[in-house]
Amino acid sequence: MSAVITPAEFNDYKVADISLAAWGRRETIIAESEMPALMGLRRKYAGDQPLKGAKILGCIHMTIQTAVLIETLVALGAEVRWSSCNIFSTQDQAAAAIAAAGIPVFAWKGETEEEYEWCIEQTILKDGQPWDANMILDDGGDLTVIIHKKYPAMLDKIHGVTEETTTGVHRLLDMLAKGELKIPAINVNDSVTKSKNDNKYGCRHSLNDAIKRGTDHLLSGKQALVIGYGDVGKGSAQSLRQEGMIVKVTEVDPICAMQACMDGFELVSPFIDGENDGTEASIDKALLGKIDLIVTTTGNVNVCDSNMLKALKKRAVVCNIGHFDNEIDTAFMRKNWAWEEVKPQVHKIHRTGPGSFDAQNDDYLILLAEGRLVNLGNATGHPSRIMDGSFANQVLAQIFLFEQKYADLAPAKKAERLTVEVLPKKLDEEVALEMVRGFGGVVTKLTKTQADYIGVTVEGPFKPHAYRY
């Protein structure tokens, strides 16, 4: 897709600068060559048009890789309207390229909170009225929640939502438990080809890149504390270790904690004996006073709280690679300490009190991306080859839900289908196979005898649902 439509012919968009479209198109073409699974699905299903009639509301980071996802959905028959799920994550050239192709998009880097909400509203609305959407593609859950709260009538026609990230899945499961979720959901985040690629290998690539772009610091020989050791934490710890940092990990889950130990990381707690009683007295000041860099990776709230921030070493770098900015207590920092912008998405946080500050003060923290996703705020996020698996999952999940036609079911059937589930393993394997082919790899086929011996078919799926990769 390379057509460029002039603003006079199409104005259902808002981006930073439409003149960046040619740049965005050049980068998109390169990204396509690095996304073999997504492009393979585009070729495989284009003739069948499995998304013909699908009207997809999308809210996911508006990057170059997302441009390839959007155009794949369109190539398979869908209509889409799009916004970004983070105020700092948009690549303006990518948004411009999508707008220039005649696809409604509302996103730019550096939105205010009010502009962010406006962009989501414009995604939902067409000509001032709710669009007759029948699918949602979300990252973090904001779009899904807004539709449930402000536009519940739209849910009568929506077949389901596909959710990209851990935080969004937590929100969906919470809504389901409370009886608030009205449409079925596919948990894309926990597909193997998403969680192992995006969450682990993607963070391994992009965290150190973002920190170095933001600070120009040498990382080797310095001490880092990674908060959380799920897939994102694992990738983050590896990212910092390969820079030569002395990496410590803190965890609440004994299994993840065990994995950190087995991977050779020192398991510590920022709290004395691991107990946080909410006071400064419970902080391990000796530990935090030596930390040069702290990164949160959990999807939880206040895992780097105000007392920890007070105890950190002077000039320590603080950042987050989880979805929302509430992993770090930025609200406390805004209320109690002075902020000095060094450059976009890099702030000195002077711990000398609110208001004015002495530029020569050396008691400050360096906060990246205002506590939001550092790899997209201070860099360009995961590379195309990583996002290939995530977005191929999104395409297959959209096809899967669209074919189920949940909105057309009888009430009794709807009650059965109202779930939050992962994509069937066979589809996960389909994504993995396309990715392997992109690397030039060759997968060995089982013989019939071998398949029978382990109780699978020659074509797969090859592992039971409970298998842990």
Curated annotation (Swiss-Prot):
It comes from the Bacteria. Its cofactor is NAD(+). Pfam families: AdoHcyase, AdoHcyase_NAD. GO terms for molecular function: adenosylhomocysteinase activity. Its main location: cytoplasm. SUPFAM superfamilies: Formate/glycerate dehydrogenase catalytic domain-like (SSF52283), NAD(P)-binding Rossmann-fold domains (SSF51735). Keywords: Cytoplasm, Hydrolase, NAD, One-carbon metabolism. This is Adenosylhomocysteinase. The gene is ahcY.
